[in-house]
A protein has these predicted regions:
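Active-site rim/loop-helix segments in enzyme catalytic domains that contact anionic ligands
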Residues: 1-90, 121-124, 227, 232-242
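Metal-dependent de-N-acetylase/amidase catalytic core
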Residues: 74-243
Length: 243
């Protein structure tokens, strides 16, 4: 999800990437080697894989909050917001990357909403400069081009592959995230511009959610619905022009 900042900070002395894994991974699908793993075994192996990724990507820190998904999907649950607030206060990031509000995974949307709430709880001067919602369980190719934030992922495809490939419990366990994630980035790069040559070999899209941390009156639902409305209008206008 956050390949761009990982690459940006990799081997740099003045840039640092900190990863926060909010949930415990207990409910993940499994087969093959992991078919007989119970939820607690899956939790432990998922944590081990996150630590491996942190070493490969040379993260400054990896924080695992270990919440069950049901806690994150509960809009009234405040402990995750409090934990995220404490992390933001300690790390003071300039940019935060989380899930986008149009993601089709309930837990991911829950993480995004709690991240927004945590940032809003900070004093205005202590808030990050940018908040991006990234692609996972729904790509963002559907957004109109003027709404897309594109991150060039042309460099270090080997490192990107390693960062995804380390999650063997997911890949061997039945989900080919290694192939799908890199293929999506290449597809984004090729299909981004219909009348021009490719300018990158890999591209990820994000939703700029920064307005939500600057205006507490702006509701997340109305914010994401505006993206959908612009997409609807774009499609309608094109069909009318060609009719």
């Amino acid at each position: 999800m956050a390949a761009s900042p990982i690459l940006e900070c990799f081997q740099q002395e003045d840039l640092w990437f900190t990863a926060v894994v909010v949930t415990d991974g207990r409910g993940s699908p499994r087969k093959g080697l992991y078919a007989q793993y119970d939820d607690e075994q899956m939790r432990l192996v998922r944590f081990k894989e996150q630590r491996k990724a942190a070493v490969i990507g040379e993260y400054a820190a990896l924080i695992m909050l270990d919440y069950p998904s049901k806690v994150i999907k509960d809009g009234r649950s405040q402990p995750p917001v409090e934990d995220l607030t404490a992390i933001l206060t300690a790390t003071q990031p300039k940019v935060v990357y989380t899930h986008n509000l149009a993601d089709k995974h309930d837990t991911h949307v829950g993480v995004a909403l709690k991240t927004i709430a945590a940032i809003r709880s900070l004093p205005t001067a202590s808030r990050p400069a940018k908040l991006y919602g990234c692609e996972v369980w729904r790509d963002l190719d559907w957004m109109v081009d003027s709404d897309k934030v594109g991150f060039d992922l042309s460099p270090q495809e080997n490192l990107q592959a390693a960062l995804v490939g380390v999650f063997d419990s997911q890949i061997s366990g039945g989900k080919r995230y290694d192939l799908a994630s890199l293929a999506r980035r290449r597809a984004n790069a090729t299909y981004f511009e219909s009348h021009g040559v490719d300018t990158s070999t890999g591209l990820s899209f994000a939703m700029d959610m920064t307005p939500l941390i600057h205006s507490e009156d702006l509701q997340p639902l109305s914010f994401v619905e505006a993206f959908i409305q612009r997409f609807k209008q774009d499609v309608s206008d094109r069909v009318r022009r060609m009719s």
